[in-house]
Amino acid sequence: MSNKEDIIKMEGTIVEALPNAMFRVELENGHKILAHISGKMRKNFIRLVPGDKVVVELTIYDLTKGRIVYRKKS
């Protein structure tokens, strides 16, 4: 189980929708990562489309993959 200290939250924009609720997200610093939807977003049927601004959680162990935890209001 990971600690709160091991998680980095960053903002980004969805670039591409991929199969199985995966998305390619471009972070504010220009890096592109692969991210999946968190369980609460999936449970509440929150739809994401390319161009949406999102908050992504990254672990310090793998900075190429993340979890989308929040969709910003546009």
Swiss-Prot record:
<protein>
    <recommendedName>
        <fullName>Translation initiation factor IF-1</fullName>
    </recommendedName>
</protein>
<dbReference type="GO" id="GO:0003743">
    <property type="term" value="F:translation initiation factor activity"/>
</dbReference>
<dbReference type="GO" id="GO:0005829">
    <property type="term" value="C:cytosol"/>
</dbReference>
<keyword id="KW-0963">Cytoplasm</keyword>
<feature type="domain" description="S1-like">
    <location>
        <begin position="1"/>
        <end position="73"/>
    </location>
</feature>
<dbReference type="GO" id="GO:0019843">
    <property type="term" value="F:rRNA binding"/>
</dbReference>
<dbReference type="InterPro" id="IPR006196">
    <property type="entry name" value="RNA-binding_domain_S1_IF1"/>
</dbReference>
<comment type="subunit">
    <text>Component of the 30S ribosomal translation pre-initiation complex which assembles on the 30S ribosome in the order IF-2 and IF-3, IF-1 and N-formylmethionyl-tRNA(fMet); mRNA recruitment can occur at any time during PIC assembly.</text>
</comment>
<dbReference type="GO" id="GO:0043022">
    <property type="term" value="F:ribosome binding"/>
</dbReference>
<keyword id="KW-0396">Initiation factor</keyword>
<keyword id="KW-0694">RNA-binding</keyword>
<keyword id="KW-0699">rRNA-binding</keyword>
<dbReference type="Pfam" id="PF01176">
    <property type="entry name" value="eIF-1a"/>
</dbReference>
<dbReference type="InterPro" id="IPR012340">
    <property type="entry name" value="NA-bd_OB-fold"/>
</dbReference>
<keyword id="KW-0648">Protein biosynthesis</keyword>
<dbReference type="InterPro" id="IPR003029">
    <property type="entry name" value="S1_domain"/>
</dbReference>
<dbReference type="InterPro" id="IPR004368">
    <property type="entry name" value="TIF_IF1"/>
</dbReference>
<comment type="function">
    <text>One of the essential components for the initiation of protein synthesis. Stabilizes the binding of IF-2 and IF-3 on the 30S subunit to which N-formylmethionyl-tRNA(fMet) subsequently binds. Helps modulate mRNA selection, yielding the 30S pre-initiation complex (PIC). Upon addition of the 50S ribosomal subunit IF-1, IF-2 and IF-3 are released leaving the mature 70S translation initiation complex.</text>
</comment>
<comment type="similarity">
    <text>Belongs to the IF-1 family.</text>
</comment>
